[in-house]
Amino acid sequence: MKKISLPKIGIRPVIDGRRMGVRESLEEQTMNMAKATAALLTEKLRHACGAAVECVISDTCIAGMAEAAACEEKFSSQNVGLTITVTPCWCYGSETIDMDPTRPKAIWGFNGTERPGAVYLAAALAAHSQKGIPAFSIYGHDVQDADDTSIPADVEEKLLRFARAGLAVASMKGKSYLSLGGVSMGIAGSIVDHNFFESWLGMKVQAVDMTELRRRIDQKIYDEAELEMALAWADKNFRYGEDENNKQYQRNAEQSRAVLRESLLMAMCIRDMMQGNSKLADIGRVEESLGYNAIAAGFQGQRHWTDQYPNGDTAEAILNSSFDWNGVREPFVVATENDSLNGVAMLMGHQLTGTAQVFADVRTYWSPEAIERVTGHKLDGLAEHGIIHLINSGSAALDGSCKQRDSEGNPTMKPHWEISQKEADACLAATEWCPAIHEYFRGGGYSSRFLTEGGVPFTMTRVNIIKGLGPVLQIAEGWSVELPKDVHDILNKRTNSTWPTTWFAPRLTGKGPFTDVYSIMANWGANHGVLTIGHVGADFITLASMLRIPVCMHNVEETKVYRPSAWAAHGMDIEGQDYRACQNYGPLYKR
């Protein structure tokens, strides 16, 4: 089966079409802008899978309808998923713009005095606004000389932010969300909304009953040699934590081995269902070998599966991580309890950064006073205003231990193409696998347990659906914090000490939901959230605006908020603008 090609970035150099001197004098400068833009993007960006980003430049500069049509024909044949129009001069606004209604688009108008690039930018954006096809504006803060081919830092930042978000939009389009199971314990995010996926993300939902997973395991629809490899890998790398079950519920060695085997099989089969596996065709399972073209998935688990079979914690933790028995690889996106809306936040974070995502319960707000009362410890530093306990039953990506290191030796989570095997091993070494608590998981399983290192910048996100409004996005930038071991132990044992923990301190602004940490917890829209490495809230905001998903709370600096130019016509308050613009334009793929 032919592999689906990755989306490319189209670069559209536009020019003043007047011959006999004007166009001729601008050809080289205009095309050089296009080449410089392409060089920047190919050097600085990668797809989430790690592949190099490709740019496609129009064969000629575009002066009018004919050349715009020729450019569009080329782009259509090369899977261009987003476009950047560049020019140093006046051109003919509506005659030269990209008219594709669902393709993210930006225009860079060169800030120079010799030719009016800014005038074209304004004219073209006016045409976009009038036609209802929003576009992003890129205009350098400082005037450049006509022969200056450098890209200023502020222009570079906008080009990269637009391109990262645009590639995410293009990469999700046409893919599917694999809903493995149905609604888990009444969790609203697992009431999978097909219209949301189709209208806002351009995706399909593949609904599959959990009996399909059971069938694949029971009928050996998997690569048996790979299973042996996975078991050997687990035997070498898994450290096991204490069994906190009552003796009557503790499993013997043979039973524990069977639970481990099935847990690894679940990971293999869910992966095969998502992306396919040619090895299955070799054993006569051609239909199953194709997979479901899923870029993200969710597994219901509780309770219809977990009351009888091993839970999904081990499978989800391994799939969500950047490594397994096959070595370092791109992490998958698999949402616990089939919380599809948290899965979408995970998908956004992965597409923007190429990193693994940490799925967690937004479990407890600990005030400084409560911690001092319970432990005698007074919080300080990043944690001085209180912390949020992010913890789930063990499905968080093992990268979340933050045993990887950046160029300065700081703890972090890296894009998978930068992770060494040594760093993957360090994450495994920092993780214990604890037998699942019988009262919760009667079928057994193993929960991963790790503690996220402190001082690491994170962005916590969540998508919610509001009846009458549609989807909204929440964003909270902050840091992981490290507590003294005795303090952590006291707090952790008050919940479930066999699960992975991140102590999270959001950045406060003193306003609205970010007045204090309690207000952030109080305004969080659901029981789950996602941690993405870095302070990347601005990228999420740009991506959300492309999809027409308003942001209902964030603590990103206003100077970093970057949305289509037409948003400015929807009022003077930038967050109200976002709601009005998203309502006005409707979902990107209107259905």
From Swiss-Prot:
It is an enzyme of class 5 (isomerase). Keywords: Carbohydrate metabolism, Cytoplasm, Fucose metabolism, Isomerase, Manganese, Metal-binding. GO terms for cellular component: cytoplasm. The active site is at residues 337, 361. Gene3D superfamilies: 3.40.50.1070, L-fucose Isomerase, Chain A, domain 2, L-fucose/L-arabinose isomerase, C-terminal. It catalyses: L-fucose = L-fuculose. NCBIfam families: fucI, PRK10991.1. It comes from Escherichia coli (strain SE11). This is L-fucose isomerase. The gene is fucI. Its cofactor is Mn(2+). Pfam families: Fucose_iso_C (PF02952), Fucose_iso_N1 (PF07881), Fucose_iso_N2 (PF07882).
